[in-house]
Amino acid sequence: YGEDGRLQSILEAAGIPYTGCGVLASAVSMDKSATKRYLQSAGIPTAPCMIINKHDAGDLQTLAEKIISEFGLPVVIKAATQGSSIGVVIPKTAQEVVPALEEAFKYSENVLAEKCIKGKELTISIMEENGEPKPLPVIWIAPHSGAYDFHSKYTKGATDYHCPAPFDEKTT
């Protein structure tokens, strides 16, 4: 809570200073479908995806077949408006896709189905210093389970964090 821009809006309306992102950045970043559209409009590549509204989804088995046909398996199914990987499921078999959709729809009216792209999980924080963006060191997030899910994020010892990430300067 407090990450979707509503709290920031209240604080701004009351003239109360706060740290962190403003209203628009918070609202966009907590809605994965809005984030994806924003990044695409800026020319930033993102994983191919399908945005599905709960009320337009129709028969979930038919939808699952369409998702598998378009993206293959494994595929990433995620609730559009949750954080901490809540409502994110990575089905590896066709039989797991419908339950993954049902799980994601518990948390959000909109769900994203995305092509699963294997790779390393990295995070880079950007600070503002003297009005200029300043990147902090790259952090490589290495969950022991292979997926940076809720368990990996909040269970002590389930994930290794490498900072700075052990990549050459060209990569970072």
What are these regions (language model features)?
Residues 1-30, 45-53:
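A short, GP-enriched loop/loop-strand-helix hinge that lies immediately N-terminal to
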Residues 3-7, 86-87, 123:
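Short glycine-/acidic-enriched loop or helix-start segments at secondary-structure transitions
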Residues 4-7, 32-35, 97, 135, ...:
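A general structural signal for well-ordered alpha-helical segments in protein cores
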Residues 21-23, 87, 166-169:
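Short, contiguous strand/loop micro-motifs
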Residues 28-120:
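Active-site nucleotide/adenylate-binding loops and adjacent lid/helix of ATP-dependent enzymes
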Residues 62-67, 164-165, 172:
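Peripheral (often C-terminal) accessory segments that flank ATP-dependent C-N-forming ligase machineries
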Residues 92-171:
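Phosphate-binding site of ATP-dependent enzymes
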